Every structure is written in structure tokens, then in C-alpha cells.
């Protein structure tokens, strides 16, 4: 684990570079990857675009030469998040609850061992959607780095409050200690430009803020 941890700075720089490229794509369309358009002409950017750009950056980065990756990787554990179509108030883990394997959005392998688990989200979905990914990442048994990466179309003070609640006041599952959060906003209204959403766990209470990127 200590060896893999040494890659944290390079990984987080890779996430930032991926976002910067996606931001350029969103404002200029000068890339082979196009932003899909709604009927009204507005662009629709999701976690899929960010994941795609990240994979391209990962494959071209010399630091990760020899590493491999897999998409929608089945989880080691069995999980149950819903009963019928209703979210469970308490998520279940293990084979005794009638659950099934979940999927990890992206897994990176060093020496053919799962070393980095990544979940991508976009546009601030609900507490349940966040909590489900937090629970899944927290409980996967392999000794790997774990990231929750979220893309926001735009942010303001109200959005920041909503993000904070979903990360730290989530009744389904809060952001675990063993999971790193990286958030990116294509346009922060206060900063008037793209921003990284930064979590500081060293403060009490934990602080969250937008910073220019």
C-alpha cells in the first residue's frame, strides 16, 4: 500500500489535467471527443466524458507506463442497496442479504494487482446515489487507493452546501476516511470560472471550498 500511495500526487494531477482538458472541450469543441447536445442546443456533460478523458490521459502518462485498467469491474463483496425499488435505510453487505456484486467504474492495476478504485459521478445526484458509492468503496477489501470523483456543470454557494451535506451529513453513508474526494466545476459562479472543489479534513468541522483551477 505504501508503494501505491507514492502515486497519489501523480494520480491527482492526472485527474486535474483530465478536467482541464474536458473544460477546454466544453468551451471550444476543438477535440475529437464532442459534447452531446440537447434539442435546445445546450451541452450535456456527464461522468462518462470525464472517465473517457481520464483513461486517455492515464494511457499517455509515462508515470503509469505498464499499468493496466478495467471498466465496470465487478466488486469483491456482495451488496444490497434497495428492497424492490426502494432504497434501504441501512445498506447490507455479504451473501446473507440477497444482494449481488456491484461494479466499480474504473480500476487501475499495478503489477496486475487492483491498486486504484475510482467512482465517477456528475451533476450532484441525490444522497442515495452518493451513499451507495461511498459504501461500496469503503468496504471493498483490497488494499488499494480509493477515489470518488465528481463533475459539476456549475456551482455556487447553494451547490456547495448541497455537496457538503451529501459528503458529510449523508444518512445512507458519509464519505469514508479511506476514500479521497475530488470535485470539479466547469463554472463556479463566485470564482467566475472553472474550479476544483477541495475538502480539508484537518479542520473541525471539515471544510469544503471552491478554488480556481
Feature map (PLM): residue ranges:
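Domain-level recognition of nuclease-like catalytic cores that cleave nucleotide substrates
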Residues: 151-213
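Active-site metal-binding core of divalent-cation-utilizing nuclease and nuclease-like domains
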Residues: 42-43, 66-112
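Charged, often low-complexity linker/regulatory segments
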Residues: 1-59
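Hydrophobic, Leu/Ile/Phe/Ala-enriched alpha-helical segments that form helix-helix packing faces
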Residues: 18, 22, 26, 54-62, ...
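Active-site-adjacent loop/helix micro-motif of nuclease/hydrolase catalytic cores
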Residues: 116, 124-135, 157-163
Amino acid at each position: 500500500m505504501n508503494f501505491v500511495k507514492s502515486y497519489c500526487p501523480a494520480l491527482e494531477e492526472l485527474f486535474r489535467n483530465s478536467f482541464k482538458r474536458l473544460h477546454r472541450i466544453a468551451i471550444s469543441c476543438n477535440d475529437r471527443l464532442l459534447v452531446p447536445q440537447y434539442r435546445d442546443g445546450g451541452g450535456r456533460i456527464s461522468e462518462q466524458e470525464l472517465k473517457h478523458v481520464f483513461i486517455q490521459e492515464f494511457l499517455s502518462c509515462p508515470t503509469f507506463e505498464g499499468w493496466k485498467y478495467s471498466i465496470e469491474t465487478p466488486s469483491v463483496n456482495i451488496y444490497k442497496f434497495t428492497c424492490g425499488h426502494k432504497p434501504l435505510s441501512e445498506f447490507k453487505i455479504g451473501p446473507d442479504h440477497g444482494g449481488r456484486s456491484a461494479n466499480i467504474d474504473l480500476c487501475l492495476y499495478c503489477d496486475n494487482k487492483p491498486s486504484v478504485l475510482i467512482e465517477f459521478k456528475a451533476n450532484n445526484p441525490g444522497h442515495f446515489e452518493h451513499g451507495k458509492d461511498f459504501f461500496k468503496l469503503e468496504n471493498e477489501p483490497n488494499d488499494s487507493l480509493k477515489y470518488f470523483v465528481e463533475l459539476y456543470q456549475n456551482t455556487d454557494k447553494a451547490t456547495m452546501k448541497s455537496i457538503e451535506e451529501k459528503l458529510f451529513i449523508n444518512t445512507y453513508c458519509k464519505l469514508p476516511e479511506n476514500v479521497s474526494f475530488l470535485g470539479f466545476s466547469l463554472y463556479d459562479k463566485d470564482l467566475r470560472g472553472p474550479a476544483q472543489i477541495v475538502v480539508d479534513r484537518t479542520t473541525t468541522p471539515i471544510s469544503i471550498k471552491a478554488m480556481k483551477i
